[in-house]
Amino acid sequence: MGKRKQIKDGDVSMGGTDPATGDSSDEDIDMVNVDFEWFDPQEIDFHGIKHLIRQLFDVDAQDLDLSGLTDMILAQPLLGSTVKTDGKDSDPYAFLTVLNLQEHADKPPIKSLTTYIKRKASGTPSLSPLAQLFSQTPIPPIGLILTERLINMPSEVVPPMYAMLQEEITWAIEEKEPYNFSHYLIVSKTYEEVESKLDAEDSRPQKKKKKAGQEKGERFFFHPEDEVLERHALCKGGYEYEHKHDEGHSDSKRAFQELGIRTAGSLILIEAGRFEGAVKEMAEYLSPQQ
């Protein structure tokens, strides 16, 4: 049985969604009502979760031990959730979990990940509070939240995952397990629109004048809930990936009018005392429109 059969009493419409706004267009989109089920992570989810972690860290995923991280997630099956549509043996379309960075500090997958995060935080002024926490010995009991979903998944599946995670953490603490966190760190990703390289090749001289003003574009969220989480953050910031995408990658993502996109990493640090309020506001923000 799933953890929870459906979101409240209704089905969720699954169709084309603009990651920039979370809005879906009525034009040329077939909407399908889907029943989503939530499950504890299980061994059969290994490849699905590993794929989603790779998607989360984008091009920098090659520097991390994805298999090791996935094994750690599956080793705590009573914490976190997967979302599926065809029973517990089907592939996960989304997942959410939390890992204790202090408890697992000496494990190789966490060592490489914390080194990566510390490097990014140290190079981003707005993330200096996070860099300071990571410089402490031992590192504080920070709960690292890893969550990702397929690109066309509705954001309404997210609040139940966070709500169940809060319940599971409470139960774990009652059982004296090491999940009494001081902070929560959410790893995410953003994007900005960029001029198409294909268009640039054909552009006329006067068109190039626009480029200077477009060097730093507006930042958009892949995960709409990040907009709410950032409002509750002790610190937040974006960073460039260490590895570069192949030439033409932005054009392969041309889902936004005539523009391509450039992706970037994002870190959101929330004090534990503010986490419940953040989750509550997120649920209100992402609640289905009546």
Swiss-Prot record:
Pfam families membership: BCCIP (PF13862)
Job description of the protein: Involved in nuclear export, actin cytoskeleton organization and vesicular transport.
Recorded superkingdom: Eukaryota
UniProt keyword annotation of Membrane present: no
Principal location listed in the UniProt entry: cytoplasm
Record protein name field: Protein bcp1
Annotated Gene Ontology cellular component terms: cytoplasm; nucleus
Places the protein is found: Cytoplasm; Nucleus
Keywords: Cytoplasm, Nucleus, Protein transport, Transport
PANTHER family: BRCA2 AND CDKN1A INTERACTING PROTEIN, BRCA2 AND CDKN1A-INTERACTING PROTEIN
Annotated stretches, region: Disordered: 1-27, 197-217
Lineage: Eukaryota, Fungi, Dikarya, Ascomycota, Pezizomycotina
Source organism of this protein record: Emericella nidulans (strain FGSC A4 / ATCC 38163 / CBS 112.46 / NRRL 194 / M139) (Aspergillus nidulans)
Keyword Nucleus tagged: yes
GO biological process, one term: protein transport
Family note: Belongs to the BCP1 family.
